[in-house]
Amino acid sequence: MAKTIMIIDDDQVFHDLYTEMLEDTDYRLIHVYDGDEALLKLEEEKPDLFILDMLMDMMTGDTVLLYLKSMPECEEIPIIVISGQPKQRYKSLKEVDPNLIFLDKTVTNEKLIQEIKARIG
């Protein structure tokens, strides 16, 4: 069965980009556009990995991350944060999840796939 990745980003352009980057993989993608939608979708299905944007209008990425890590059913699910902001801005989130991975919005296909495979195969 294909591993599932939930993409949480309020920008359709990045959803399209990640879909294109991962189109030659066997991963199944779930697209949600804000934190509230992500939390609702989690009632239906649990992904194997999250790709999370930090700068979103409705609920910021760090708030979403804190919610996810406070949920027993999600606390072990890996999160890859992809942001255009400097990593240092979110350094304190490593205390919540020491395995958190930060990637720049300009991440290459190869790097993104490498990081995903390292976490969920």
Language-model-detected regions and their locations in the chain:
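Active-site beta3 strand of CheY-like receiver
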Residues: 45-51
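Two-component/phosphorelay signaling modules centered on CheY-like receiver
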Residues: 12-30, 100
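Acidic catalytic/metal-coordinating carboxylates
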Residues: 34-37, 59-66
